[in-house]
């Protein structure tokens, strides 16, 4: 009986804290989609061109680099 009461009270407490947190953070994440989009653009794997030492099988090398060693597995961007 005591354990059941403790569980019920803890669930109510956690639910109340979640609701309070949701109310206070409702307007804090404006433009979240735009921020995530900008973060995705800055990821190393999301660049439009391959940097030095990266593979150039599926995307072209960055300016100033060329694709060398283009065998069956693709080449590597080198200056």
Curated annotation (Swiss-Prot):
The modification 4-hydroxyproline is found at residues 60, 63. Pfam families: Conotoxin. Expressed by the venom duct. It is found in: Secreted. Residues 23-47 form a propeptide. Disulfide bonds join 49-62, 56-67, 61-77. Its main location: secreted. Residues 1-22 form the signal peptide. The keyword Disulfide bond applies. Keywords: Disulfide bond, Hydroxylation, Ion channel impairing toxin, Knottin, Secreted, Signal, Toxin. GO terms for cellular component: extracellular region. GO terms for molecular function: ion channel inhibitor activity; toxin activity. The presence of a 'disulfide through disulfide knot' structurally defines this protein as a knottin. Belongs to the conotoxin O1 superfamily. Ion channel inhibitor that inhibits the increase in intracellular calcium upon depolarization in DRG neurons. In vivo, both intraperitoneal and intracranial injections into mice induce hyperactivity. This is Conotoxin Kt6.1. It comes from Conus kintoki (Cone snail).
């Amino acid at each position: 009986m005591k354990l059941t009461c403790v569980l019920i009270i803890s669930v109510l407490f956690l639910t109340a804290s979640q609701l309070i947190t949701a109310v206070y953070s409702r307007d804090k994440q404006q433009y979240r989609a735009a921020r995530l989009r900008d973060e995705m653009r800055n990821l190393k794997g999301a660049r439009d061109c391959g940097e030095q030492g990266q593979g150039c099988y599926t995307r072209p090398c960055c300016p100033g680099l060329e694709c060398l060693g283009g065998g069956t597995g693709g080449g590597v961007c080198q200056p």
